[in-house]
Amino acid sequence: MKPRHIPVFDGHNDALTRLWLSDHPDPVHAFIHERLVGHLDLKRCQEAGFIGGMFAIFLPPYSYVQQHHSNKLFDQNASDFTQQQIEQICLEQLDLAHQLAQYSKNIKICTSVQDIQDCRAEKKLAIVLHMEGAEALQQNPDLLDVFYERGLRSIGPLWNRPSRFGHGLNAKFPHSPDTGAGLTSDGKDFIKRCANKKMVIDVSHMNEKAFWNTVDILQQPIVATHSNSHALCPQARNLTDPQLKAIRESKGMVGVNFDVAFLRSDGQRNADTSIDVILEHLEYLMDRVAPLLHPRSKLRKGTHKRTPGRAGDAD
């Protein structure tokens, strides 16, 4: 008898970026019909009761692409992506998401809660499109409308890099989340535009000043899709108790990040880490954010080191 799986809706994964980086001649076909290298593909989602999640459109650091996927570079002699290239990369990942839905009757891009509920009932994989770091939208304001019309419903305005919208957040350990300036005036206006579209605003990669800027702007639940407790792991990426209190007061939620460097009290990226460490963060967050609502979101594909005993989503 197969084990019965609890339905999982994942708060954050990097599957689209991995497909964009893939050397496979047909990564969309591979995701649908094969077992891809990494943690996430359709078959393992179905085996694990993985009903869907927030699929991130993300610009990988230039240095990472240069070192590991140099065939994806537009100019081998450049030192960074141009704005036009940033926009193209993100649009290509958006196209990959639509190809997944086009070529599989078991995958759907969802733009509403009802869509997600329908996918669960029909045993389809629900893709909610998210953008992690909004650099692709910083020069051409109309691009937000383009991405929205094609299904984007969640956005993390900042990543670790500085942009027109704000300072970003360096993942320092040990360190407080106060790593620099907060949102720029353009960043505040951008968040207001996204909020007017009823989009989810993800604070997971915001430094402390940007976080509080966002709290002051939003009249909606505050969401951190993949962040942990700073009290348990003093990593700048994690959330302090006052931040958790603000999220609770907004009726928001926090998803646990499975990257062990953001879980362990010593900040080490050591895969030999007990699952008990995850449970400790989960219990801490539930107690402080939503004792009656237990979000179990995970940073999956894209994590450098995961806890042992898990080869992928089926585990």
UniProtKB/Swiss-Prot annotation:
SUPFAM superfamilies: Metallo-dependent hydrolases (SSF51556). It comes from the Bacteria. PROSITE patterns: RENAL_DIPEPTIDASE_1, RENAL_DIPEPTIDASE_2. InterPro entries: Dipep_AS, Metal_Hydrolase, Pept_M19. Residues 296-315 are annotated as: Disordered. Residues 296-308 have a biased composition (Basic residues). One of its GO terms (molecular function) is metallodipeptidase activity. One of its GO terms (biological process) is proteolysis. Belongs to the metallo-dependent hydrolases superfamily. Peptidase M19 family. This is Uncharacterized protein in PQQ-III 3'region. It comes from Acinetobacter calcoaceticus.
